[in-house]
């Protein structure tokens, strides 16, 4: 799998890219106003524990505050997970988000690929279960 990252307007120019979590309409007025207010705090380092966000989400969703992991995007969290788990063998359906493979390679994890098929809508089929051997200790599944 070739490494690429979505949202690369510097290579491909302006485009609507659904592979990244970016609003093609741009930020809302509420977000722009919040960003302006945040500029007043730009001399201070952000709260690396995200205490206010953690507290509000836990309260709203009625779950324990320890249930959250925050990062600067999905890719950072994937790398954090892979570095923490230090998996030895992964099962990775392809085609898929390239960051899964890249993160696994950073820890020298052996990757066993499961090729999905176009004629099956790139869905995982029953034969996937045959690939689930005891030595596989991490799997990435996505839609």
Where in this protein do the model-derived segments appear?
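Short beta->alpha connector loops at strand-helix junctions that form conserved
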Residues: 94, 113-118
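N-terminal "arm"/small-domain region of PLP-dependent enzymes with the aminotransferase-like
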Residues: 1-44, 140-141
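Short, structured coil segments at secondary-structure junctions
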Residues: 64, 107-108
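Short, well-ordered alpha-helices that flank and scaffold nucleotide-derived cofactor binding pockets
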Residues: 33, 37, 59, 79, ...
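Conserved PLP-anchoring active-site segment centered on the Schiff-base-forming lysine
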Residues: 84-104
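Active-site phosphate-binding strand-loop segment of PLP-dependent enzymes
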Residues: 118-143
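Short loop-beta-helix segment that forms the pyridoxal 5′-phosphate
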Residues: 46, 58-80
């Amino acid at each position: 799998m070739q490494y690429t990252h979505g949202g690369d307007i510097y290579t491909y120019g302006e485009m609507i890219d659904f592979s990244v979590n970016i609003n093609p309409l741009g930020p809302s007025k509420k977000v722009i106003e919040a960003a302006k207010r945040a500029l007043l705090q730009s001399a201070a380092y952000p709260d690396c524990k995200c205490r206010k966000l953690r507290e509000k989400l836990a309260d709203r969703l009625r779950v324990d505050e320890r249930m959250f992991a925050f990062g600067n995007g999905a890719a950072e969290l994937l790398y954090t997970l892979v570095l923490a788990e230090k998996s030895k063998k992964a099962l990775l359906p392809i085609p898929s988000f390239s960051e899964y493979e890249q993160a696994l390679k950073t820890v020298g994890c052996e990757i066993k690929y499961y090729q999905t098929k176009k004629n099956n809508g790139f869905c995982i089929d029953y034969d996937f279960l045959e690939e689930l051997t005891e030595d596989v200790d991490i799997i990435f599944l996505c839609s």
